[in-house]
Regions:
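Extended, histidine- and acidic-residue-enriched regions that form the cofactor-binding/catalytic faces
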Residues: 1-104, 112-257
């Protein structure tokens, strides 16, 4: 495994000649309840990327620690950048790696709020620069709840010394927006509105309107049970992408008739 930030330029030169694939981890610095560190998303993204890089030999770029998190802005310590700035920055980082020989960029994303912008970045790389790019969330489907039991368990697995379980809370989400009744996060029946976390929870533990999110039952063992099989699955996928001819992963021209 190679963390790009830990090698010299001469080592990097050799590295890019030997491997045309890179992992670009990204997350956020935002509140994750009173018990989890603000860096939860980017810390998990970095740790997961390292685990996959260790197994596949794919270079891991430095983690991008700040993303699209303005909806958590009322909680002290949360940092964010506007979506257009984030898109431009992520594209620029990816293209910098490509200037040294990367042809496949795998964006390992730890924060759901980044996803729409990252899909646009991946599309631009594939469409405009002949670079295959894909976006992966750094946790498997079914890990629901912001700062809930599963995410907290993942934190305990990767960096338990940063988690303060004595502060963990179980939080039932608010369902009221003034006189109106919410039917989901940011939903009023068939209508959606731009919500902030504070609309739903005073603690930052978040799930869905009217839903109780539990964080007090989190354990390191649960985190290992979540991330162990998922790591194996992603390792197999990354190895297949690494072995593929990048030109075969690009869009094909339309052949009329």
């Amino acid at each position: 495994m190679v963390q790009l930030a830990e090698v010299s330029w001469t080592d990097a030169q050799k590295l890019f000649k030997e491997c045309d694939t890179v992992i670009l981890p990204v997350g956020s610095t935002e509140q994750h309840g009173p018990h989890n560190p603000l860096g939860t998303d980017h810390l998990i993204a970095a740790a997961f990327s390292k685990a996959v890089g260790d197994r596949t030999g794919v270079p891991v770029l430095p983690v991008v620690p700040v993303g699209i998190s303005e909806h958590h802005r009322q909680f002290p310590g949360t940092l964010w950048v506007p979506p257009d700035v984030f898109r431009d920055y992520m594209l620029s980082v990816a293209l910098a790696a490509c200037s040294h020989g990367a042809r496949k960029v795998l964006i390992f994303n730890g924060h759901g709020g980044n996803t729409p912008a990252l899909i646009e970045v991946a599309g631009a790389l594939r469409r405009d620069y002949d670079v295959f790019a894909a976006v992966l969330m750094t946790f498997p489907p079914g890990v629901d709840g912001h700062a809930g039991s599963k995410e907290t368990s993942m934190n305990l697995y990767y960096h338990g010394h940063l988690v303060k379980m004595d502060r963990a809370v179980d939080q039932t989400q608010d369902t009221h927006l003034g006189p109106l009744q919410m039917t989901g996060i940011g939903r009023l029946g068939p209508m959606e509105f731009p919500w902030d976390t504070i609309d739903l929870t005073p603690t930052g533990v978040l799930g869905g309107a009217g839903k109780k999110i539990v964080s007090t039952t989190a354990t390191r063992k649960t985190g290992e049970e979540i991330m162990g099989p998922f790591t194996e699955e992603v390792v197999r996928l990354v190895e297949a992408i690494k072995a593929a001819d990048p030109d075969e992963l690009l869009s094909k021209p339309h052949k009329a008739g």
